[in-house]
Amino acid sequence: MRRNGYWFGCLLGAVMLLVGCQGTEEPLTTVEGLDWREETPVWSMVSTAPEDFGITYDDLTDLDGYPLDKLAAYCLGADGVFAEDGFDQLYCRFVEAPRTWVTYVSLLPEEEQKILCEHTALAAASWYADSNEFSESLDVLEKAYSSGAEEVVISMLRSEYENAAV
């Protein structure tokens, strides 16, 4: 009898422990009006030197798997057909994740910002004949960043886009 009481007590204790651990979980933050274009940057360093990423321009590489920081370094060091493919990918990355793109580019020196903005805007105006995604993204970004380094990059993009679209 005593043995059954021991096991019953153990079982009851385990059940109470499990039930107590399964309380209602509430989110740590509320998600009100979360922008669908919200992204989380994942770059590990800010460098635009192709050699920092082991980039060589010996043959055409598949740039789809390049993270944004490596792609930007690739574009800034490339010329000819290498640059064309790189800036095409850079435009696609902007459309996919405009906030991440702008945040990363805003960390770079002004000269490199200008190059990346110019070629990305040119791709939007020339190659893609503005599929409206670019313009809509710029509108959203201008509302989200009304000052700071990101605003400078967005203004640069808008200016380059308007010049290219003429």
Could you tell me what each predicted segment is?
Residues 1-8:
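Bacterial N-terminal signal peptides that target proteins for export
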Residues 11:
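Short beta-strand->alpha-helix linker/helix-N-cap micro-motif
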Residues 17-20:
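C-terminal motif of bacterial Sec signal peptides marking the signal peptidase cleavage site
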Residues 25-166:
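Non-catalytic all-alpha helical scaffold/repeat segments
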